[in-house]
């Protein structure tokens, strides 16, 4: 299995900290957030990592290089325009070379047993497994409805309040089979939550949900970043 970390976001809500660095380079626990992800993947046995870049694209490669000092091989994709999540991932089709991929949103911090997630994915046999958690404000996330076998029946990105039927939503870590690339067109920009997951369900592809029970935080604002920094030493194995 290979890994792709999506890191192209502008990080405008983290200004002024992101004036000179991408948001994945903001420090938590004395290290850039992205370093925590890379070290975790290396510990879990992942050696090939793809990273997409847009905002201040020189910063990440100048720090991580080819990844050798972290025990991995890093492959960079430099985007000339900012893309949605699925289109950003599509750029790694040749890198994946037919292998399964774990995909991580670079601005999340979480606790996760990757081997258990992959075992779950293998047992279910779907095209994709989406990590899930409960959200206080599900209207800001992609929410899901599942059956008793954890198969996803419905995925709704950022629903209106009257459309909310559950607070269980997307936690930003996926495992994809390589054939998922076939469902991401190149004619325009595509997002996983708004476009690809609903499309897969319409075409009767099996998506499964894996519930996270440990720590998870979306570091999208200065307030959440400060919380992550305070929480870091209170939890084990945060990445």
Task: Write out the residue ranges for each language-model feature.
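A structural signal for short hydrophobic beta-strand segments in well-ordered beta-sheet cores
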Residues: 25, 143-146, 197, 209
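Histidine-centered beta-alpha loop that forms part of the nucleotide-sugar donor binding/catalytic region
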Residues: 8, 54, 133-134
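Conserved N-terminal catalytic core of the sugar/cofactor nucleotidyltransferase
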Residues: 2-5, 27, 31-105, 109, ...
């Amino acid at each position: 299995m290979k890994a792709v970390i999506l890191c192209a976001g502008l990080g405008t809500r983290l200004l002024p900290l992101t004036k000179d660095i991408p948001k994945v380079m903001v420090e938590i626990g004395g290290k850039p957030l992205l370093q925590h992800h890379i070290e975790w993947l290396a510990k879990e046995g992942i050696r090939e990592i793809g990273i997409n870049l847009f905002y201040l694209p020189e910063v990440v490669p100048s720090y991580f290089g080819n990844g050798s000092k972290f025990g991995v091989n890093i492959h960079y994709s430099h985007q000339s325009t900012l893309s949605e999540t699925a289109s950003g991932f599509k750029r790694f089709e040749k890198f994946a070379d037919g292998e399964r991929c774990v995909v991580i949103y670079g601005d999340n911090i979480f606790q996760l047993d990757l081997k258990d997630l992959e075992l779950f994915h293998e047992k279910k046999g779907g095209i994709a497994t989406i990590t899930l958690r409960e959200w206080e404000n599900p209207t800001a996330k992609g929410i899901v409805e599942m059956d008793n076998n954890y198969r996803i029946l419905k995925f709704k990105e950022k629903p209106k309040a009257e459309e909310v039927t559950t607070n269980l939503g997307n936690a930003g870590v996926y495992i994809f089979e390589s054939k998922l690339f076939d469902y991401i067109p190149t004619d325009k920009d595509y997002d996983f939550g708004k476009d690809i997951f609903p499309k897969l369900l319409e075409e009767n592809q099996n998506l499964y949900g894996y519930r996270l029970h440990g720590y998870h935080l979306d570091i999208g604002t200065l307030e959440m970043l400060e919380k992550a920094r305070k929480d870091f030493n209170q939890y084990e194995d945060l990445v």
